[in-house]
A protein has these predicted regions:
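Solvent-exposed loop and beta-edge segments used for protein-protein assembly and interaction
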Residues: 9, 16-18, 29, 82, ...
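Extended, loop-rich substrate-binding clefts of extracytoplasmic carbohydrate-active enzymes
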Residues: 59-122
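Acidic (Asp/Glu-rich), glycine- and aromatic
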Residues: 114-138
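Beta-strand-rich N-terminal accessory domains
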Residues: 1-61, 154-178
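Solvent-exposed, well-ordered amphipathic alpha-helical segments
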Residues: 82-85, 107-110, 135-136, 168, ...
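Acidic/polar low-complexity flexible segments
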Residues: 137-144, 172-175
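Intrinsically disordered, low-complexity, charge-dense segments enriched in Lys/Arg
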Residues: 142-157
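Short, surface-exposed beta-strand/loop "edge" segments at domain boundaries and coil↔beta transitions
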Residues: 40-50, 93-102, 124-127, 138-139, ...
Length: 178
């Protein structure tokens, strides 16, 4: 793992990960990392851009449109002593909720990137998920969480590839107009 980045936030270089024709690039914006996923195919670039800040549904900074990530590290994943692929891990905070993220090439699709997100909740969420802008609309990914217990950890995962965004392990994907 690379050492913690001690540079001032305004001088943090982009962090990227790729899988085939898909690349995710994280850039520092204000007080958090934001990202864009691009698919280069057939001479065109299709992109998904994270929507950051308050979610339009909740309009409350405690419930951001996408997980707030304030620290990122690029790591090399290992499994059972064998060398694995690259990964980006991140952590962050919004209100009383703590986020963690793992971003890796999807182990089941050669041309996709998998996002696995966890949020530790201490109060009932108004909104919880990930949101992307694409082609004038919004794509929202939410967890299948049927619990009301607090505190609790909610996990959602999704994969982004040439075919679009797909929920993994019960996550649901919906599309709305912006």
């Amino acid at each position: 793992m690379e050492p913690h980045d001690t540079r001032p936030p305004t001088s943090r270089p982009p962090v990227a990960i790729a899988a085939g024709s898909i690349a995710a690039t994280f850039t520092w914006a204000g007080d958090r990392w934001v990202h864009r996923i691009a698919h280069q195919g057939a001479g065109e670039t299709v992109g998904w851009t994270s929507l950051d800040g308050p979610c339009p549904i909740a309009n409350d900074p405690r419930w951001p449109a996408s997980p707030v990530l304030v620290e990122l590290s690029r790591v090399g994943a290992t499994r059972a002593g064998a060398s694995g692929g690259p990964a980006i891990v991140g952590v962050g905070l919004a209100g009383r909720s703590h986020f963690s993220a793992s971003i890796t090439p999807d182990p089941h699709a050669s041309d996709a990137i998998r996002f696995e997100i966890a949020c530790r909740l201490h109060e009932a969420p108004v909104w919880l998920g990930s949101t992307y802008r694409v082609d004038g609309g919004l794509i929202q990914i939410t967890a299948a969480d049927g619990s009301d217990a607090l505190p609790r950890t909610v996990v959602w995962a999704y994969s982004i590839g040439p075919q679009g965004i797909f929920g993994v392990r019960g996550a649901s994907v919906s599309t709305t107009t912006a």
